[in-house]
Amino acid sequence: MKDIWSAWTPLEAKIDRHSAEISVWNRVYRFEDSLFPTSIRIGGCDFLSRPIEFVGRYNGKTERTLKGCTLFELESTDEKTEFQLSAQMGNTVVNGMIGVEFDGLIDMRFSVIPFWSFSRDNLAKPQLDQLYIDIPVKKEYARLYHYWPNDVTSIIPSQTVVNADALPEGGLRMPFKPYVWLGDEFKGLGVSIESDENLEYENAQTEWIPGEDEFVLRIHLLDRMPAAWQGRRDQWVSALNPIDYRIGIMATPCKPVSEELKTSWRAFHVFGNLYAANSDGSVVDCPYINEIDGGLDYLAEKGVKWIIFHESSSRAQDWGLAENPERFRAMIHDCHAHGIKTMMYFGYEMSTLCPSWYDHAPDYLINTPDGHYTGGWQRLPHQRAFMVCYRGGYGDELIRRVEYVMDHYGIDGIYTDGTYVPWECANARHGCGYTDRNGARHTTFPIFAVRKLVKRLYETVHSRGGLIDTHQSTCCIMPTLSFCDTYYDGENIQGSLIKALGSDSGITSFMSLPAFRTEYMGKNLGLVDQFISYANPALGWSIEKTCALTLIHDVLPRPRQAGEMTFESLKTDLDYMSKIWKACAEFETASSVWLPYWQKNDLANVTTEETYMSVYQGKRTLGVLSNLGSRPREVEIQTPAAAMRDVFSGATYRAENGVVRFTAESCVPYLLEIL
């Protein structure tokens, strides 16, 4: 196994004619005469209540097992294993090629093939009229769900929909979504399907079906005989084509999160433009952060370990091309001299200023079914940038540009905006989309192509000792996110959170806490999240209020600089966040045992409505309490401790009859040392 994959453990595979057992970090998949896993273990727990079933219905008769099933090992290394399956179900042949990689992705390509024209007993006539996959998960683990995209299009996410939540007792039904996930706060299972081309379903394509001791995730493939087979039978001169599928299955979390990463990931995001326009349209340069008197001294003093330079760090959007290389290198050098590492922006677009625009734009860009481009961001220097599909060749250029900025500018890592998102695309020039039987074009979602790119990206950056932070709002597709280090989520819902904050119902009236735990906490994914906080003092929204929501989930928001580059613009978020960082370091939260608010513990439990408290148990014990209601309230904390001390104010609250009481303001986090 390459050293670059040291975050994971080597894959181990045991495959014989009838079974396969594949072990990766924290997970074990087992196949017994089956196309899909019969057992999935996550962290030593049996996640499934019973084997996954591949179910077919033939002339009204339901088939749940494969006949004559054999497996054949093609390749096995400590990074990947691949084996074939051959079987029969009803009057169809089932063939498959199953690959499992070291991060836990099962890449399943399989075909359902009608019997040939020489079959006896009328078996040459197609009989298949239903096909689906049942994934039965133990009810104790089947509590949360996520899907993507959160709207009818993936090109721009809805600002009013959170595509994650607690699983309703009565279950759920949805149309086709290329990614769905089911699990709890610490583990789960995701299913990826790039295309709905061979999905012929009547109503819902995905169902979460409740049972007595399980929830079944049902993936509908066919609710009727395939249209291409109807009214026909196989002939030697005109065969019935196989129906092909490609499905990814991946248990999560994908990898361990190191204590060192949690401790050192103190990032500060510089959004301020390096360009400005005069009234006559001419473009002028703006100050760099190292040119602000005392700016880097202040950032270092406040504990910043990483600076992320946003899009205007490149002359051409997403291209990693500094306007003034010497000046840019000097800025990076000065950051390093202050003990601060740097990241440069790359994203999901190709600029009209990109040197290869005129040669390759038609091949690289996303196309809608009617041939239009998508996006079109406009910025200085004057340009527009349209969305790329990483199934095209732009990924090769991206890798070269990342190598360039790390090798020539001394950049330490990269921030990717949307790069890990498999945006829908219908560009036939690079193989996306499909044409249906009526001649209409449809989009597909290049999940596996994006995965291939970001895996290369991870190699490129980590071989140079760097990190990758990705912004992917609403999209928690683990086959791609597996190859980043941290993620930055929540941009699309900032407006809705602000609106909810000002309502009588409070912030959770828009986003439930189970929704936050599913998408924004990261523990079920194996990643560190930093929540987006776009402070808006005029509307009462600050990074402190964001902390009230995030800190009880062991998640830190990211401070940022926005607007004109001035010393004051550095302080908007950082004066407060530096105190949070200092407290986390003082109490060694990264190495402490974390006791979440939704599970009772022996140290501190809040009984007050809309108030929540999580605890870090270490050499010293720290509680984080938030009143997420819309008004101040007196809170009651049941505890065996003698008292609690407010880390920021120094106030001490003594317990009376095992209860600590004090008044907590709305949406203000309280860091309390439990004495």
Language-model features: where?
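Active-site-adjacent "subsite" loops/lids of carbohydrate-active enzymes
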Residues: 284-289, 328, 332-333, 342-409, ...
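Polysaccharide-binding surfaces and accessory modules of carbohydrate-active proteins
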Residues: 1, 99, 107-206, 649
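Beta-strand-rich recognition/accessory modules
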Residues: 18, 23-25, 32-62, 88, ...
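Aromatic- and acidic-residue-enriched carbohydrate-binding clefts of CAZyme catalytic domains
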Residues: 308-324, 355-393, 422-451
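Active-site neighborhood of glycoside hydrolase catalytic domains
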Residues: 390-481, 491-495, 502
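C-terminal beta-strand-rich structural cap/linker in extracellular carbohydrate-active enzymes
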Residues: 656-675
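Acidic-aromatic substrate-binding/catalytic surfaces of carbohydrate-active enzymes
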Residues: 1-10, 14-90, 139-161
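Active-site-proximal substrate-binding groove within the catalytic cores of carbohydrate-active enzymes
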Residues: 240, 446, 451-639, 643-648, ...
